[in-house]
Structures are given as C-alpha cells and as structure tokens.
Amino acid sequence: MANGFGSFYIGSSGLKNSQNALNTTANNMANVNTTGYVRQQVRVSDKHYITRNNPTAGTNIQQSGLGVSVSDVAHVRDIFLDKSYRQENGRKGFYSTLYSTTSYVEDIMQEMNGAEFKESISELWQAFQEYGKDPTNSTNQNLIIQKSELFLTRCNTVYSDLQKYQSNINLQIKDQVDRINEIGDKIYALNLEIQKTESGGVETAMTARDARDSLIDELAGYAKIEAEEDSTGYVRIKLEGQQFVQDNKCNHIGLTEEKGTGFYTPYWPHITTQESYMPVFSDVALPSALAERVGCTQTTNIATSLNNDIGSLKALLVSRGSEYGTYDFMSEENYSRVEDNVVMETQAEISYLARNIMMAMNDIFCPNTTYTAADGTTYTVLDTANCSVGADGSLPPHELFAREGYDRYTQMEIDGKQFYVYNDETKANNSSWYKLGNVSVNPKLAAQVTLMPSYKQDGSANYGLADQITKAWSAENLYINPKDTSKCNFEGYYDKIISHLGTNGSIYKASSDTMTSTAAAIDNQRNQIMGVSSDEELTNMIKYQSAYNASSRFITVISQMTELIVQLI
C-alpha cells in the first residue's frame, strides 16, 4: 500500500512537469516571430529519493523516488557567437554606410536635373574652340560668357549639394548618438530589473534579458563595444574603449557643435576637462577649429588590421569629413585630412578642378610676370608687353573669372614707373581666394562682352589666344591626388573623380557584402541555438502531451489498483 500511494507522487510530478513543459513550448510558439526572443528550454531532474535502509557489505541501498521536477527553464544563448555576431554586425554597419554615402555622391556628380556635370566642362571647351576661330566676334565672346556662367553654376550646385548632404549626414550622426544614449539608459534600467528578479536565485528574468540582448546587438551596429556580464546578471559595456554602462549609471555621449558648419563631434563629457578633450573616436580627424582649440591633432587612421573599422557612427563621421573640402586640401601636406572622407574629398576635387580652369583662363587673358624693384622687393605684375586688351584698348584687361569684391590688379608706382600689381591670395583674407563661392564671371564682361581681352594692343585680333587656350586645356599636368602617378587634363580630371568614386564604391560594396554574409552566417548559427523552430516546438508539444497522457494513465492505473486492493480488504 505504501508503494502504491507513493506512486501517486510519481504520477503527479509527471503531470505537473509535462504541463509546465507544454506551457513553455506554447510560449515559444507564440513568440516564433518576435524579434530578439530567445528560446526557452525545460530541464527536468529527479526529486529527492527516500532511503529505506543503509547499505551493508551484503546488501544494496534501498531507495524510492518521488518523481521528477523542473530544475530549470534555460535561457539558451552562446556568448561566443554573440560576441562574434556583434563584431561582424559592427563591421557590416561600417562598410554598408560607406557604400551608401559613396553611391549617393556618385549620383550627385553624374546627374543634375538630368544633365551630367561633365557636359558643362565639354561645352565650355567647345565655346573656347569657337572663340579661338574669331576672338573678336561678339557671338563667340557671348558664348564664352554663357558657358562660363553655366560651368560655375554647375560647379557651385554640385558643391552646394555635397554641403547639403554633409548636413544630412550630420543630422544622422546626432540621431545615432541620441539613440546610443537611449539604448544605454535602457540597458542600465534592464540591468537593475534583472538583478532584482534574479537576486533570490529562483527565477530567471527572461523577458528582460531578451530585451537587453537585443539592445546590445543594436548598439554593436553603431560602434565598437565590449559587453561583460557578472555573476549577478549585470552587464557592463565599454564603447570605443571607454566605460559606457557602469555600475551606477550610463555615461552619455555629448556633441560638440562647430560654428559655421554646424558639424557635430561626439565626445565623453564625464572625462573631458578644460585641459583634456576626450572625443569618442580617437582615430577620426577632428574639425580644424576644434583641434586647434583643444590642442588635439589626431588624424583618421582606420583599417581592418587595427580592428577599428567597426560601427555605422564612425562611418558617418568619416564620410562627412571634418569640414567643407576646398582646393588647398589636395596638396601633399593637407591631403591626409580628406583622404577617405568621401564627401569632403569630392568637394576638394571639384574645387581644385574649378580653380585650375579659372586660373588657367585668367592667366591667358591677363598674363603676369615679375618685377624686382630697386630695393630688392619682387612684385607680381601684369605683363603689359604680352597681354591682350578689350575693344576699348584700356589697361589692365578684364579677367574672365573675378573674385567678388576683389580686383585682380592695383595700380602702383614702383621705381618711378606705373605697374599693375597682382592682388595675390592671402590666408588672412578668404575673399581673396579663387574658389567656388568667391568667384563669378566678371560682371563687367557679362555686361559688355566686347571688353573681353581679344585684341592685341595695336587693335588687331589676337588669334594667338587660340593656341594658348588649346595648350592650357589639353595640358596634362593635373593629379587627382598626391598619390596619383599619371597626369591628366581638365576633362580627364573629372573622369578620374568618377573613377575614384567608383573604385571606392566597389571596394565598400564588396566589403559590405562580405560582412553582411558573415554576420548572417553567425546569426544563423545563433538562431540554431536560441531561435524558435515551429517544427521543433510542435514536435516537443506532441512529446510533452504524450508524457502528460502517460502520467494521467499511470495515475488512473494506480488509482484503480488501490481501489481494488481496498475492496479486497
């Protein structure tokens, strides 16, 4: 009788545990399509055994069991796969962002209201060819003015579109920083919730853990992170090598906004002092004004070998660049500041191309020479012996591309002689630069095209201008950047800009595709462990239902047997 009644415990435990397993399986099935949900797995173990007598040398131990119990409902994850996935997901975010920005810049360069930017260069060259046939013809002169205005308009439009895109990227940077801070706050709150729930050692905070792990996965796509969980279930996170989620708080990322451009630079407010500025990314160049202000001269240095090509936020900073690109960034000493900054580098290239065309044409219409005064001072002056003049025959001649509010020459008396001294560009005065935004077609020529320097000083047509223009236009003396080894002319320079963008885009796309495939493969491995398979859960449901039915039949048999025994007594 004792064994019979004890068997009720065994059957009862079977019913309870099968029911619990069915509930867990049903919960898995209900969340089969829930993002971030981790499969729950019931683990069953023996209950305590009752020892009937102590074993001796001649007898075995006699024990009777009380059935089984649910020892744990496992929250199945693989920390090694999690770590690998988060790193590769960060790399995917980095290269996908670079590819996206490069593709957009290509679109800006090649299409403007249905017309390729290159057409404006070709049309300007055709206008100069027509002009060379008869430089005194007002129709040809007017064509030069029109095509020059069109060329500058398209240059300025492309440059402006790139600036607008930089502003768009800048807003994306702010949005991502805000999201990172929001994620950090949520992870910190979930840490406290998990600690509170699991402090008794009885329950696992599965829903909170799922939410936290999903947030960490998302965070890994924005920046390089390190996540470490302690024995209490609390996760501490480092972001770009600095403490982000700590024991008592989440350290928010701050943003420094530059005057003029409005560009944001992420930094760590909690460790930044008046003596030391701590940017979030130590491997991305800072805006020049900020770098000078805080005494930090870091440059962009990112490579897979350095394990720092991680995170879409860094890719946005690299793509946007630290400021607006200008022609002077194409020099050997400054090129490192725009290299790999796709928007800023393209701006610098367009500015450099426009400047070289403007300078070449101005130097033909208004050639300069040098004069050394008696006191040893050397001046750059108008070459009056070889320059052309307009129909009015006056000096100095009018340049084609003029700086707004800044004349090309100033008349001076040197050593008792009259000279037209060239007003050179100076670093102290930005308006003195021949650069996009500062330059327009000379308004005097636009108002009266016959003032274009097309005549020799004896009043005859200067047909020699055609050879000078052809030589300047076809001269192959431009490099796309200091690392380029083959020279090109003006039209070839534009082709190299597009080729350079296309090459970088192909590299970024290949890297993006590779990282996407790698991250997907690791995620598939994770899902095999933590994901919910409806087929597998249906199989488990049938198994646990069968176990429930078996336990029910077992209890029925024991009950009938007990009833029969009682009746016989």
Stretches with model-predicted labels:
Residues 1-569:
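Structural signature of extracellular appendage/secretion-system components
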